[in-house]
Amino acid sequence: MIIDAHIHCSGNEKSDDVLRALDEAGVDKAVLLAPFLNGNYSMHDRDSLRSANRYLSRLIAGREDRLMGFAVINPALDEASADLRVACELGLRGLKMVPAGWYPYEECALRIYETASDLRLPILFHSGIFIDGKSGRYCRPVFFEIIRDYPNLRVTLAHLGWPWCDEANAVGLIDLINGVAPDNSQFRFDISFGAPPVYRLEVLRKAIAVLTPGLLQFGSDVFLPCSGELIKSRMDDVAALLDELDIDEPTRQRIMGGTAAAWLGLGVD
């Protein structure tokens, strides 16, 4: 099973087109994030985020066998925990959080972790710098260690925390050092690369060596609407790196689907 665990919605896509793109790319299932990065939606407005989450619920309706919707929540806004519960009632199965103006260990974020833990929802965090020039100071991997205070949470740090990839490896390694099996680990890391191409091979080499493939998962980080060709090109980029690292087929399958399946509570075909 191939799972694309990091796809952005824009608010302009149609479910049939999304499924067609996945089919063209050879992707079985995908995590879709509620829109929050275009002019029609804002991360800093509660009504906007509620509208985005409702939109995503409608988009995936009847397609939940392949499309898993993740709500977008800003913990700094009033009633964020209540909005997360509403999103769950709408059929969304996880949440995306972007530390921007708040640190992952702040009280407002802890309330969301409590709610997500209660609802058993996985969390995808942005980690590392932002490509638009906003400060990434809130998104260093070490700041997410607070997650360990919520043992039922299962989270993924996107982009391997670039440029703090060694720090991300250190955070993820703790469970492995203590004998926790990858499928039961609290932390996973997506390889939707923030690293420029010149760094990517070494970043992935270290991550595989330190974290094992059991904690690494594929995400294209594309923005919908898009072609299957674009998604496939991101898959091909990863495949080329794995070729250079002489990675075997079972390991590739783990990175391209198995790790995300465990994170999402899915069976692996």
PLM regions and their residue ranges:
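Mid-to-C-terminal alpha-helical segments outside catalytic/metal-binding sites
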Residues: 1-5, 11, 16-29, 85-86, ...
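Divalent metal-dependent hydrolysis catalytic cores, especially in the metallo-beta-lactamase
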Residues: 3-5, 10, 18-42, 66-72, ...
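Conserved, mostly hydrophobic/aromatic
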Residues: 6, 22, 56, 60, ...
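A cross-family glycoside hydrolase active-site/sugar-binding cleft signature
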Residues: 6-8, 33, 70-72, 96-98, ...
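Active-site environment of divalent metal-dependent phosphoester hydrolases
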Residues: 10-13, 37-40, 75-79, 102-104, ...
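Active-site gating/metal-coordination segments in enzymes
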Residues: 37, 46-138, 183-186, 193
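Ligand-binding grooves and catalytic loops that recognize ribose/phosphate and carbohydrate rings
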Residues: 37-62, 112, 131-146, 230-248, ...
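Catalytic pocket-lining loop regions of alpha/beta-barrel enzymes
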Residues: 94, 106-217
